[in-house]
Amino acid sequence: MSTRMHFSQQTLSLLFDAILVDDIVDQHIELPAYLPTNFSSEQLAECLNLCQQLWLEGVANTQLRCLIKKIIIHKNLNSEERLSYKYIRAKYKHMGFAFILYTASHKRPLLFEATSTLMGEAQDAFRNQVTSKTLSTGLLLNAITAWPFSQFTQQYVQNAKLDPQSFMQHFKNDGKRIPEFLASHSVTPAQFHALRKIISRHVSFFDTLRTLYPNEMYYKMSRFLSAINGMMGSMHDELVQKSLLKKIDYHKDKISIPNE
């Protein structure tokens, strides 16, 4: 494992505070004059290191498994448990975006992806009181977060490595995909979610960057993208609810992308 910088608890807290508002729509949103694209290898390496440290020090597998067992038994979580679950999932999502952004494969490792995805599906299920789905996702989560799988997941995070050249190409390609989506007359909910994931990972990048390098332009990019992310998130929550209630086919039915 390569040597990494170690950041203070204050820096970790600043990043997590930014993550917690990455879907909040500010009253006054201003897009920067231009999209920043000139990032040094040192900046990118520090961003990845911070994401790794946030996950490694901020996600306790024992706590996650305790919550999973409650999901299995009660098919739900109380308000305090939901908040703990939300915080763990937020750190999983942020590290997941880091795998996609910074590493050469631009993919989450399969086991990490499965855990993060199932956490989201379980949350959607218990929020919407779909007990059968809550139980099935809970059982799967219980299996893949047990030892030795939990050890593999930790090693994936520890061993994630930056590819600076690949980052820039992927970052630019993401930027090209957004107008392609928006030019479509209609998309499936799954395609809409794919577009939101692009926005979300760019939010995560600028959240991390502005934590390490406080800068008005980075802050504006983070908050502008967060506003879009938040509006899309509210719409996606409704689509997920309709899908769970069998009112729409998540992968086949078409929806219109809002103009505003």
PLM features per residue range, with description:
Residues 1-260:
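Function-determining surface determinants
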